[in-house]
Structures are given as C-alpha cells and as structure tokens.
Amino acid sequence: MAEALIVFDMDGVLVDVTESYRETIVRTVEHFAGVTVTRPQIQDYKNQGGFNDDWKLSHHIVAQHGAAVEFQTVVDYFQGLFHGNGTDGLIQRERWMARDGLFDRLAARFDLAIFTGRLRWEAEVTLHRFAPSLRFDPIIGMEDVTALKPAPEGLLKIAAAAGGRKIWYVGDTVDDARSARAAAVPFIGIASPDSPRRAEVASLFQAENAAAVIDDINQLESVLA
C-alpha cells in the first residue's frame, strides 16, 4: 500500500471529452430545443457550478429555451447518441490524455482511484479501451453516491477507506474543486489552455483554495514532486 492516494475525476482529466460528452450536449439540445449551444456557453454553465451532470445540464438548457421535455426523455436521447449501437456512439471520439509512461511512474509512488460523475460502467468501458492494465481502486461513479458533486460524498467514501493516508483530488471543474474543499482534500485543478474560459476556470480554482493549477494531467508530477 502506497503512502498516498491520488483520486482523479475522469472527463477533462483522464480523457478529452470535447467530441464526446460536450458534443452530445450540443446535439441533444439541438434535437429538443432547435437551438445550437456553443462550447463556450457550455463552459459558462459548468463554471456556475451545479452542472456536473451532463444529463441535468442538457435538460436545463432545453427547458431554458421553452421546450417542455421530461428529464428521462432527455437522458434516453443523450445516451443513445453517446453509446450509439456500441461502435458508432460519440463515446468513440474520446481521447486518452496521459502520455506514455505517466501512469507507470505515478503507480510506482501512489495508489490511484477515480471519483467521477459518469456511471461507473461507462468509466470502466473507457478505461478498458485506453488503459486496460491500469488499476484504479476504488472507482466511484454517479450511482455510488446519493448526492452528486459538488457534494463530497464520493471523496469522503474514499478517504474513509484510505486509513488516514494523504489524498489529492485532480479535477477540471468548479464542482470538483468544491467537492474537494468540502471533503478537506487538497485539490489540483486542470485548466486547459484549449478551454474557451481558461482564465476564469483557473480563477475559480484559486478561489476554492486549489493546491495547484496545471494545464493538463501530464504536468501532475511537477506538483507532486
């Protein structure tokens, strides 16, 4: 057992979801509301907090544009786009963000875990695709908590099982930062230079007392040295 544990969010941290989850939001809103929401607008919602769940965000935007659609109807359409028939869904557009060797080095020093707003099985599908030999334990998904981020429940569960070891949480949204702060876990924020609101994201992380703000996961070792 390593002396410390790194907990990762998944979307925007381990994988680039610009053309998967974010594109699914765009297409779902277009389908139900007949409007095109832009990537900067999606980031603006994320920066408000409370929209870690992309189903909830999609439904909210649809409702804002006057379309009365049941939440589950939005979820079903969203999931159909995301998964497709198993081979043509937008999930196939995801890109693994870690460079070769990064996790070999991290795993030699730390135990690794995941606390994500995804369904756990969706996280496992992506991990199996990109990093089948990599061990994250535990993997806490949305079905494993009663309150989604920014609630700290997932981090508190991981901390309770960590036996007092030091924990870091690596995330890319203000909800991740607030979850970490509520759990009294040091937060490392990822503010991608490709983000349409990069400066605002970094400022929000600093306001939540982030231990560090980095461009992407490949800079993580520099702040854990």
Range-by-range predicted roles:
Residues 3-10, 14-100, 108:
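N-terminal helical cap/lid subdomain that shapes the substrate entry/recognition surface
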Residues 13, 20, 120-121, 175:
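Conserved Rossmann-like nucleotide-cofactor binding loop
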Residues 32, 100-146, 153-162, 203:
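Substrate-recognition/cap helix-loop segment adjacent to the acidic, metal-dependent catalytic center
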Residues 42, 46, 72-75, 134-149:
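A short, structured active-site edge motif that brings together acidic residues
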Residues 169-212:
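Acidic, Mg2+-coordinating phosphoryl-transfer loop and its flanking beta/alpha structural elements
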Residues 211-219:
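Short acidic-hydrophobic, aromatic-tinged amphipathic segments that line or gate anion-handling sites
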Residues 219-225:
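Short amphipathic alpha-helix with an adjacent loop that forms part of the alpha/beta core around
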